[in-house]
Structures are given as C-alpha cells and as structure tokens.
Amino acid sequence: MIILKLAGGIIGFVFGVVLCNLIWEDTESEHSISSKKINLYYLISGIFMGCAFLCASHNFEAGHCIDSMFMLGGLIFLAAFAIQDILQLAVYAFLLNVGVIGMLLLRCTVFMFDGEFTKMFSFLIISGTVYVGLKIIAKVFPKFMGAGDYDILFLVFLLCGIEGTYQVLFASSLAGLLICIPLLLSKRIQKGEKIPLAPFFCLGTLAYLWM
C-alpha cells in the first residue's frame, strides 16, 4: 500500500503549506521575516504535516482503522501547534483548547462506538487528573513549563499514554539538542533566546508513533 502512504504524505504536505500560509497572512504585519526564511518555514510546515499523514497512513495499513483516525486527528493538531509556534513563538489558546477538547471527544466517541463505557469513564478520570497535574506544575514552575506547554503535553499523553509521553519527552529533548547546539555554535541563535518548543514535541511524537 505504498500508494496510500504516498497519497497521505502529499496531501499532508500540501495541507501543511496552506496552513502555514494562512497563519503567516494573519501575523505578517506583526513579524518581519525574509522571503527566504518564510519559504523555509513553508517547507518545514509541509514536512511536519506530511509526516503526520504518513504516520497515520502507516498505522491504517497495519489494520488499525479507528486508532488511525484518532492518531491523525492528534497529529494534525500537534503539527498545527508546531507550525504556529515556528512562525509566532506562541500557540493560540483557542487552538490549544480546540485540540484538547476535540481529542477528548474523539477518544470518547471511539469508546462509545465499541460499547466500552467503563473504559471511557476511567479514561476521563485519568485524563482529568493528568491535565490538572500538568496545570499545577505549570503554575508552580512557570520557568519549567509555559502556559501552553501543558496543553501540548496533555495532547501527547492522549496519543501516547504515560509511558509513551516519557519516551516522547526524551526524543524531543534529543532532537532539541541535535538541532540547537549547531545553531548555537554557528551563532544563528543566541544563548537565552526563546525557541519554539512545539516543533520538538511534534518530532518526538512522530518518532515514537512511527516506531
């Protein structure tokens, strides 16, 4: 089913570029970015969204149809967060809330479709506990976790579970080191400069789900 993966990747790439363009048009007056840099952002956005669709297509090919739809929904939101964070160094609270609520509703729909109401209630209780815990950490340690970071981490938890989230954090940290250290050494970014975190969470999640 190479055609399915190829089609998914192409559709995702185009969707990512279009989404990047929409976000850029919304923020163009607030940020000054060279045409060369914005073209690079278009490419990165297309790759992020293309990989999201490709990963879901890979899971669909393995026969996990319903899980693939849930995975695709979560990865689309994560890729959208990454694209906006790259362009604006922030993710809209509205987009974060839509992502979290949408994924919760989608997961509950899957449980109801399978008639697993007990699992659904357990899932809601555990998810609520994790969300509150992340929000408390963000309040107590604002330098450790930003206001929107806990929403993104919660979305990662919904996609990957608790153990998977640990692995995603490790993979994200590794990706951050591999990308940021060369940029620091070449002085393309300065020490202490704010960097977007959502792209690294997206990379870590894609790596975990693909494996």
Q: Where would I find each of the regions flagged by the language model?
A:
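A membrane-topology feature that recognizes alpha-helical transmembrane segments
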Residues: 1-211
